[in-house]
Amino acid sequence: MIISERIFYIMEQKNMSQLELSRRTGIATSNISDWKKKKTNPKADCLLSICDALDITPEQLLTGKGIDTEYKDT
């Protein structure tokens, strides 16, 4: 699972919309939408604010440890 997929998986688990993630992080909704469409990936400087908004650690976001139940990285 790539990082953007993991972000949306966690958002779904937390019933969080793209607009809510945008409000919590200050990241434009258009950028978040591009991640969903797999046009781009989140920039490294956004990862900590995404982790804070989703209440996860950077390790969880990058590796999926402790959060992925349906998907397994191979």
Placement of each model-derived feature along the sequence:
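A short, Lys/Arg-rich alpha-helix, primarily the initiator
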Residues: 1-16
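Residues within the helices of the helix-turn-helix
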Residues: 8, 19, 48
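Short, charged recognition helix plus adjacent turn
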Residues: 9, 52, 62-74
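The alpha-helix within a helix-turn-helix
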Residues: 11, 22, 51
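Residues in the helix-turn-helix
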Residues: 20, 31, 60
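Recognition helix of helix-turn-helix/homeodomain-like DNA-binding domains
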Residues: 26-42
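DNA major-groove recognition helix of helix-turn-helix/homeodomain DNA-binding modules
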Residues: 45-60
